[in-house]
Amino acid sequence: ALWKDILKNVGKAAGKAVLNTVTDMVNE
């Protein structure tokens, strides 16, 4: 279903954003 694909993409984007934030915090 289309909404499932959208949800998956949103989840991936959110996961990447969280990962980037954590990585930035660790690097500082």
From Swiss-Prot:
Has antimicrobial activity. Belongs to the frog skin active peptide (FSAP) family. Dermaseptin subfamily. GO terms for cellular component: extracellular region. It comes from Phyllomedusa trinitatis (Trinidad leaf frog). The keyword Secreted applies. The keyword Secreted applies. It is found in: Secreted. Keywords: Amphibian defense peptide, Antimicrobial, Secreted. Expressed by the skin glands. Its main location: secreted. This is Dermaseptin-2.2TR. It comes from the Eukaryota. One of its GO terms (biological process) is defense response.
